[in-house]
Amino acid sequence: SDPLGFKDLLASKLGNVYSAVQDFPMQNTMFQPVGGMDQIAKAFEKRVGKNIRYHSEVQTLRQNADGVTVTFKDTLSGKVSSVSADYCLCAIPLSVLRNIDTDFSDKFKQAVKAVAYAPVGKIGLQMKRRFWEEDDHIYGGHVLTDIKGINTISLPSTGWQKKKGVLLGYYHYQNTAIEISALSPAERAEFALDAGQKIFPAYRSSFESAFSVAWHRVQYNLGGWAEWNDKNRATAYPVLIEGEGRVLLAGEHLSYLTGWQAGAIESAWQQIAKIHERASA
């Protein structure tokens, strides 16, 4: 066949595909935990579950020369309790931490407030049959589209040839995420189905159920991930990465791999080393 003309290549927005692999994280070989990404969190729960307090909303964080005290409320009973320790490694997103009553210095509080968080939304669509495999012989991968609000439809990379399947119906950010999140869950599903129907003829007829999330509207997230700019990396990041007193912060927001579990884990290792160093001094 004849090669496409340069004008046609530009019109196809092929550059958007290449731009997705320019960032360092996208250039590396990636693996998925068997059973889904939440298996990493479940593995932590399996190892340290006895130390986890569920339904516990942090109310205050106070420290002195000897230790740190965190006050929290049981969201089921309303009971307020507290726990104290020599050090605190706080993994609460900055978007949430800034609204908690702390005794951080003004400089530290300003650094916490300086970091913006990305509005992000996704929807999972369960299909009663895997039409993309049965009809189109597509196994895994992504469908990149210029349909506003959709961005990417991702097909499952596991469970091939099984009866049902869950695909990612949209993955959007910023203003588009804010607009779509204003819809009800049912309206979000309708929006995703209307768009997907333009690509796959069996999209709507195969639909069974949906689950959507807008992370900027989730109470304990208030955003998909931290969005650093050059200014804040130079001013706020050095303040936050050092922590204050006996409180250190950790999470994807305290790494250069924001939005990734890998960034959160690397951040934790780094901060644990600091606690060990300070406690051993």
Residue locations for each model-derived region?
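Active-site/ligand-binding neighborhood in enzyme catalytic cores
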Residues: 1-60, 65-67, 74-76, 84, ...
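Core domains of carbohydrate- and sulfate-ester-processing enzymes
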Residues: 2-13, 95-96, 231-242
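A short acidic, glycine-rich active-site loop
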Residues: 30-31, 109-114
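Short hydrophobic core segments
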Residues: 58, 82-95
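Conserved flavin/dinucleotide-binding core of flavoenzymes
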Residues: 67, 73, 78, 91, ...
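Flavin (primarily FAD) binding-site architecture
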Residues: 90-108
